[in-house]
């Protein structure tokens, strides 16, 4: 296992629970300064502090996994993922089968994103250290969840900073279909995990969409950067008078059109508009009572 020794006086943030160690705090790396993987962290007096993941090319050199001397293996990931899954299941509506299972540092799994879309999982391994543990994570997910397939979509600028290559493809089970149908708070959506934005859907906006339903009645609404039309559909479900869904991407608007139909909303009750949101906002004056911006 890699061993990291901190400079004198730099152990404080880690001892207080900070999940990151920056490169400037490190005195020495033993076992391979250019290697990524699991590393033990010690202070300058050789006291063990924590166990984390080393990213040799990142300014955030270490991301802490645990402050306990526990093995970083399949059982470790099974425990962490089970805990995060239990938290979600305790608050989610039964009419929801799409949500984030693992949210990086928020679930003490730095560099790992796992999103559930109905019977499929989409993963992102966004740090060099977590990338090294890909097979272990996939094994834990396969054992815990009866997913039809596990798909990887690791891409974006953050990978350049970590010194790892983008990776997109099937990790286990079946490949996802071209479009997956999901349900969120009773509304249905088709999503494209391969070509869509992020992992296929903006799961982090679920609560904001639900709030919009409660304030949309009889209002004229401009949904900027509308993508697959999720805010528009929630607004129509809340009784909105009129919706304009604005996006610069034609494929996104086509996806929104399908989702409107899937939820029983006639396209005639809303307008799908291709254009630049910033330009349109300057020109529309006070025509819209609500303007979701995501």
Language model features by range: what are they?
Residues 1-118:
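Non-catalytic accessory regions of SAM-dependent methyltransferases
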Residues 21-22, 41, 50, 121-124, ...:
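Short hydrophobic-aromatic micro-motifs
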Residues 57-63, 128-135, 141:
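Extended active-site and interfacial segments that coordinate phosphate-rich ligands
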Residues 73-80, 129, 133-137:
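Short amphipathic alpha-helical segments
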Residues 75-79, 83-89, 95, 146-163, ...:
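A short, charged
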Residues 102-109, 113-115, 132-202:
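Non-catalytic substrate-recognition/targeting regions of SAM-dependent transferases
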Residues 118-130:
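A short interface-forming secondary-structure element
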Residues 174-294:
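Rossmann-like S-adenosyl-L-methionine
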